[in-house]
Swiss-Prot record:
InterPro entries: Acylphosphatase (IPR020456), Acylphosphatase-like_dom (IPR001792), Acylphosphatase-like_dom_sf (IPR036046). Belongs to the acylphosphatase family. This is Acylphosphatase. The gene is acyP. It catalyses: an acyl phosphate + H2O = a carboxylate + phosphate + H(+). Its EC number is 3.6.1.7. It comes from Deinococcus geothermalis (strain DSM 11300 / CIP 105573 / AG-3a). It is an enzyme of class 3 (hydrolase). Gene3D superfamilies: 3.30.70.100. Keywords: Hydrolase.
Amino acid sequence: MRLTALVSGTVQGVGYRRYVQRHARDLGLSGSAENLPDGRVEVVAEGPPEHLERLLHWLRRGPPHARVADVQTQYSEATGLRDFHVY
């Protein structure tokens, strides 16, 4: 399964993408985290549904200096991504 999440709030410049990468890799997920020009972070992750739900918990929490205001999610079929990258 594939999760696409758009995370808004204070999520750029606070280590959010590396935080997501660490938790995604710990869960065995593949995908990416990328800063968007509008201040949000887009997270794409693929793996078992129960692992995606655990990642979603971490997305909503964020690292200490982040302030997550909203997480919009969409689920779709996995496309076979490998590893987890930060852009």
